Swiss-Prot record:
Keyword field contains Transmembrane: yes
Domain of life: Archaea
Protein name per the record: Putative transport protein MJ1177
Cellular-component GO terms for this entry: plasma membrane
Lineage: Archaea, Methanobacteriati, Methanobacteriota, Methanomada group, Methanococci
Membrane topology listed for this record: Multi-pass membrane protein
Residue spans crossing the bilayer: 13-33, 61-81, 138-158, 191-211, 234-254, 259-279, 293-313
Biological source species: Methanocaldococcus jannaschii (strain ATCC 43067 / DSM 2661 / JAL-1 / JCM 10045 / NBRC 100440) (Methanococcus jannaschii)
Similarity field: Belongs to the autoinducer-2 exporter (AI-2E) (TC 2.A.86) family.
Main location: membrane
Stretches assigned to coiled coil: none
Keywords: Cell membrane, Membrane, Transmembrane, Transmembrane helix, Transport
InterPro entries recorded: AI-2E-like
Compartment(s) of residence: Cell membrane
Amino acid sequence: MRFEEFKYVRKGVIVGLLIMLLYIIWPFIDVLAYSCAFAYMALPVYNILRKKFNKTISAGLAISIYILPIMTITIYALLTFMEIILSFNTKSIEPYINEILSIYNSFMLERIINNEQIIAKYIDEFIKYLVSQFSGKIIDVGYLIVKVIMVLFLTFYFLRDGDKAKNLIISFVPDEYKEKMRIYLSYLHDSYKNLFISCVSLSIIITILSYIGYLILGVPYAELFAIITGIFALLPILGGWMVYISIAIYFFLIHDYTKAVFMFIYGELFLSIAPDFVIRPYLVKKEVDIHPVLVVIAFLMAPLSLGLSGFAIGPLVVGALNAFYLAKYRDKKI
């Protein structure tokens, strides 16, 4: 075999292996996306810790500091949601339930009672359904736990060894395109920092600040209102102001003017002015600011299309395209 022929065979083998690798990791593409997202979100904390600790300790501490508040807020929200469900007053809908049951009894129940085989059949099918659903949920929970563990490990390694990824990618690029790839990766890094640090991290900070404010005022279900405020803060036009202004109006309507004024001032200072004019400029560069339409696509359309994985995959895709546009067409550097 001549050298030229061997080169084509080698390239074919490499392409085949890459396709096989893609096939293996495709079911876990959401794990990779979330790991990348969490790594960027924890990057500011990692950079601060890196001044005093080595890479391994800094990455571990950054993950702990960043993920613990998220887990705490999520657990609070779930417990609050369960409390709302358990405290639901069923007496208000009892007349409707009784009416439905009476109609059902008059048409169906007498025929079913007269046929014991039908009763046994329905009971058997119901038990099989419960068993299949329960076993399926156990498998789903186990699968989810495995994915969460994988996200934690991959986030750790992305933080610790992320700087090596750039050199690894450039090493696969032909020499004449290495400089352009270097420029594009720089834009990509800034674009992801803007999306994940500016948008997502800012949303988490607003969630925590709003939770503190709602607790001080004694707002019922403060955890849920704080999470809603953080989610609204992600979206253009809407914003977290819709939540705290509504709460202020509520206090005003019940003649609790002190709380209404406090909610308005606290919301304006800590949930609007401070995030936009103090925290956001500190986190990201203005030159790579993301257009509001792209934010909607990344954080609203992508989750609606792809499910929960869209919260991570959407920003990754939008960030990559935005970086290409900025480098290629706006600044004409590649």
